[in-house]
């Protein structure tokens, strides 16, 4: 179960509503309870739902950071286009079939081959959830192997998300370096509430931010203040 907990590093530090927080906590509890009691197929279903939540949060970040690209990605979503454009929560994406929503990952350069691999996880979930007389995950070893596969996929999607996170962080630095003009005078508060909470950032997202190369902003008139803001993020969140 220790390896399974790694998925938590790809889920947001905090959520915009108590309902979202409660939902994620419920899924973790369902996974842990079923895993501990040997109900591995049900544990897999909960873990899959946590994984799809990660995907929804990734797509949400694309929507927020690159709205133009997101709109282009809506081609073929005629029935759901309005709802997706006006979405106020990542979970609005759940109205679209999981296999279909994965197409948005093309916006972060995931090719058809990779998306096909990710879609296989959805197929596995469907087979496990239907009353077909089969127990696909009857042993801990079987589920652990599937968790390893899922985490590889999640890590791969995270790697593809790096340009989106870097873009989001760059904009944050440019727009929030002045303590007199931002919402919170203290840099740590601004980072926590506006960058991390406001963008559903995860531990792995913040790891990307902490490695951001400030050289691309060296000519900016406020590079010193930008550097200070970045240093606070590194000091508060950098690991390893």
PLM features: residue spans?
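Amphipathic alpha-helical interface elements
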Residues: 1-101, 117-120, 152, 159-181, ...
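Acidic-enriched, low-complexity/disordered segments with a strong bias for Aspartate over Glutamate
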Residues: 2, 29, 69, 80, ...
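Detector for Asparagine
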Residues: 9, 34, 58, 112, ...
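Charge-enriched, short contiguous segments at helix-coil
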Residues: 18, 104-168
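A mid-sequence interfacial segment
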Residues: 92-107, 206-217
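Short flexible/disordered coil segments
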Residues: 125-135, 193-201, 231-240
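Acidic, Ser/Thr-rich low-complexity intrinsically disordered segments
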Residues: 172-230
């Amino acid at each position: 179960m220790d390896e399974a907990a790694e998925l938590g590093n790809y889920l947001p530090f905090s959520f915009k509503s108590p309902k979202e927080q409660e939902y994620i906590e419920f899924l973790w509890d369902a996974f842990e309870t079923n895993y501990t009691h040997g109900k591995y197929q049900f544990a897999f279903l909960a873990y899959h739902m946590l994984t799809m939540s990660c995907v929804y949060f990734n797509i949400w970040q694309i929507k927020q950071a690159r709205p133009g690209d997101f709109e282009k990605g809506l081609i073929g979503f005629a029935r759901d286009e309005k709802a997706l454009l006006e979405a106020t929560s990542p979970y609005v994406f759940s109205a679209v079939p999981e296999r279909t929503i994965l197409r948005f990952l093309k916006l972060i350069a995931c090719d058809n081959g990779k998306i096909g691999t990710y879609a296989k996880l959805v197929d596995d979930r469907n087979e496990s959830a239907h009353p077909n007389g089969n127990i696909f995950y009857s042993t801990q070893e079987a589920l652990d192997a599937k968790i390893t596969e899922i985490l590889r996929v999640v890590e791969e999607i995270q790697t593809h998300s790096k340009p989106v996170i870097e873009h989001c962080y760059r904009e944050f630095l440019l727009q929030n370096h002045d303590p007199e003009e931002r919402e919170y005078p203290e840099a740590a508060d601004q980072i926590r509430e506006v960058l991390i909470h406001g963008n559903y950032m995860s531990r792995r997202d913040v790891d990307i931010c902490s490695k951001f190369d400030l050289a691309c902003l060296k000519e900016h008139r406020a590079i010193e203040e930008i550097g200070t803001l970045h240093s606070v993020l590194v000091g508060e969140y950098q690991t390893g």
